């Protein structure tokens, strides 16, 4: 029964991307979902795609402030759980402005790299890891912390070190150097 539920979850996760428009095949997928009103091209890297999403302007500004552009343009591969502008706006008042100050660059870098998992973990790989882990997958982040991925009904949920949980709202946005999963909350390291 558990395997059937996981199989249904994989189908829903993959099906969520089927209606999206995308660019040409980059060897990964014939289509990519639209993100923030912009086409995402599997032949472009994470940064070159993210700058076009109107839903990720805060994330892009933070990546620039933390000097992570070069890293996220490198070959990777990376899996990025990308919080939306609304996710950043839901943080306590003043948090984003404080993080973007030059003196807080180490903290900002830690928060951002906590959203990055080395390697390419698309939906099927993530679901396989959840299944292999008996319903949860512990993911080691680029910051050295861990995230826990689980299923809640047909949704993939990602839980941070503080117990906060984000839902993957758009999965499998393939990039030349990895894959992005859009999430609805900012994940915070311990």
Stretches found by the model and what they are:
Residues 4-6, 18-190:
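Mature, structured domains of secreted/extracytosolic soluble proteins
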Residues 13-16:
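C-terminal motif of bacterial Sec signal peptides marking the signal peptidase cleavage site
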């Amino acid at each position: 029964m558990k395997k059937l539920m996981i199989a249904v979850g994989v189908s829903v996760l993959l099906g969520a991307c089927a209606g999206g428009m995308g660019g040409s095949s980059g060897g990964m997928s014939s289509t990519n979902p639209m993100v923030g009103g912009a086409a995402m091209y599997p032949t472009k890297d994470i940064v070159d795609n993210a700058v076009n999403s109107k839903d990720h302007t805060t994330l892009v500004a933070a990546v620039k402030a933390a000097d992570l552009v070069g890293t996220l343009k490198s070959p990777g591969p990376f899996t990025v759980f990308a919080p939306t502008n609304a996710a950043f706006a839901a943080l306590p008042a003043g948090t984003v402005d404080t993080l973007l100050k030059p003196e807080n660059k180490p903290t900002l870098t830690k928060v951002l790299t906590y959203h990055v998992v080395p390697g390419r973990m698309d939906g099927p790989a993530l679901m396989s890891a959840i299944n292999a882990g008996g319903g949860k997958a512990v993911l080691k982040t680029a910051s050295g912390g861990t995230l826990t991925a689980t299923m809640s009904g047909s949704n993939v949920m990602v839980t941070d070190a503080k117990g906060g949980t984000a839902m993957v709202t758009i999965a499998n946005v393939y990039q030349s150097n990895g894959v992005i999963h859009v999430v609805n909350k900012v994940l915070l390291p311990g």
